[in-house]
UniProtKB/Swiss-Prot annotation:
Keywords: Cell membrane, Glycosyltransferase, Membrane, Transferase, Transmembrane, Transmembrane helix. It comes from the Bacteria. Pfam families: Glycos_transf_2. The gene is ydaM. Disulfide bonds: none annotated. The lineage of its organism: Bacteria, Bacillati, Bacillota, Bacilli, Bacillales. It is a multi-pass membrane protein. This is Probable glycosyltransferase YdaM. SUPFAM superfamilies: Nucleotide-diphospho-sugar transferases.
Length: 420
């Protein structure tokens, strides 16, 4: 029995490791080629479309001023741009700060959510903002984001030059990466996610996931889909599946860059990532239940990726860890004990290799300090994710059983400028 469980757990772990090695190669290839189309795309852009940028905001007085300054500095004709801040049930000075900007710049305006939609979450806030927008292209940014000057232009450039693209997603970087050890972990995690999961899947399968920020989507698509799902905690992943089901693809175009804050304490990280994990579990369960109604095979492939990530892979890791701990105190008579040790060591070195090669894509991230951080990350941050996924699954099941209402979770913000 012990041997069987061991082989199952190890198989699940190695399938995911090898798949991510494959994705890493794709991400690296995409990095080498994605800028080649820019000159040709620029020539093709005879006229820029009207763009509406939606910024959902709930008690964001700490960061909203910096975000709006970045919006003012965007390289995009202001007569073709509208910035809509959705003030969702804020009790701080968010509204006052937005009003300061709207009085000075006529392309900035504020939408205030009203009952019964006020305070219902990001999806509901986006729907309120969308209803007041008139752009042919809709961009979304979180309230803590500082997009680079060319970000929106590049998102539009990628979208308008690809008729099959329903949406284009850019790259986000961690603005407070050097603040704490946790933010250094998150910085490495986000780089790997974007170049492996986003860049790799785009290169090999023409698949990418809409993130919560720094993306552009066609207005016509949002209208066809009836807006964002206000029951989804991971509204971005949920929207992704529905866009693919319409027959479009989602392009990963890392020329469009934004900088965002990440949690600086474990408590804030736990709450935020629990919401993310629950959101993705909701999406997997929602669309697996509609499995035979899905029209596009590409979606099915991506659903299995999320199912494997949030269910089977973590099950394999948990089982592997449990076997290791139990075997310390009780001999399970594993016939492959030595082989197990070799495979565990190889898995660790493969993890280190994948991450360091991916970090080499970002010029400033391939250094000795990050090597030791990745080493430490394997034994701490990665293990914390395992506990979090178990907890989030428990919370999501309880949420479904008791039919609890989706609430906006406010991630803590910090006063700062770009670091590290």
């Amino acid at each position: 029995m012990g041997n069987t469980l061991f082989f199952i757990s190890l198989s699940l772990i190695w399938v995911m490791l090898l798949y991510h090695m494959f994705l890493m190669q794709g991400g690296f290839r995409h990095y080498m080629t994605f800028e080649r189309n820019i000159p040709k795309w620029r020539e093709n852009m005879k006229e820029l479309p009207k763009v509406s940028v939606l910024i959902p905001a709930h008690n964001e007085e700490v960061v909203i001023r910096q975000t709006l300054k970045a919006m003012v500095n965007l390289y995009y004709p202001k007569d073709r741009l509208e910035i809509i801040v959705v003030n969702d049930n804020s009790s701080d000075r968010t509204g006052d700060i937005v009003n300061e900007f709207s009085e000075k710049y006529d392309f900035i305006k504020m939408v205030i959510t009203k009952p019964p939609n006020a305070g219902k979450g990001k999806s509901s806030a986006l729907n309120s903002g969308f209803a007041e927008s008139n752009g042919d292209v809709i961009c979304v940014y979180d309230a803590d984001n500082t997009p680079e000057k060319m970000a929106v232009y590049y998102l539009v450039l990628g979208l308008m030059n690809d008729e099959k693209a329903g949406a284009v997603v850019g790259k986000f970087r961690v603005i407070n990466a050097a603040k704490t050890l946790l933010t250094r972990f998150i910085n490495i995690e986000t780089i790997c996610f974007q170049w492996m999961a986003q860049g790799g899947r785009w290169k090999w399968f023409k698949i990418a996931t809409i993130p919560g920020t720094n993306f552009a989507i066609r207005r016509s698509i949002i209208e066809k889909l009836g807006g964002w799902d206000d029951k989804a905690l991971a509204e971005d992943t949920e929207l992704t599946i529905r866009v693919y089901n319409l027959g479009y693809h989602i392009r990963f175009f890392p020329a469009a860059i934004t900088w965002e804050q990440e949690p600086e304490t474990w408590k804030v990280w736990w709450r935020q990532r629990t919401r993310w994990a629950r959101g993705n579990q909701y999406v997997v369960l929602k669309f697996l239940a509609q499995f035979f109604k899905l029209k596009r095979k590409r979606i099915i492939f991506d659903l299995f990726y999320f199912f494997f990530t949030y269910f089977l892979f973590f099950f394999g890791v948990i089982m592997s860890n449990a076997i290791f701990v139990v075997n310390l105190f009780y001999d399970l008579h594993l016939s492959v004990g030595f082989l197990a040790m070799i495979l565990w060591i190889l898995a660790f070195f493969l993890f280190m290799t994948e991450v360091m090669i991916t970090l080499s894509i970002e010029k400033t991230e391939m250094n000795k300090q990050n090597f030791f951080i990745v080493f430490l990350m394997y034994f701490t941050y990665s293990q914390a994710w395992i506990v979090l996924v178990i907890y989030s699954l428990f919370v999501e099941i309880k949420h479904r059983l008791f039919k609890q209402e989706v609430k906006w979770y406010k991630t803590e913000r910090y006063n700062q400028h770009k670091s590290g």
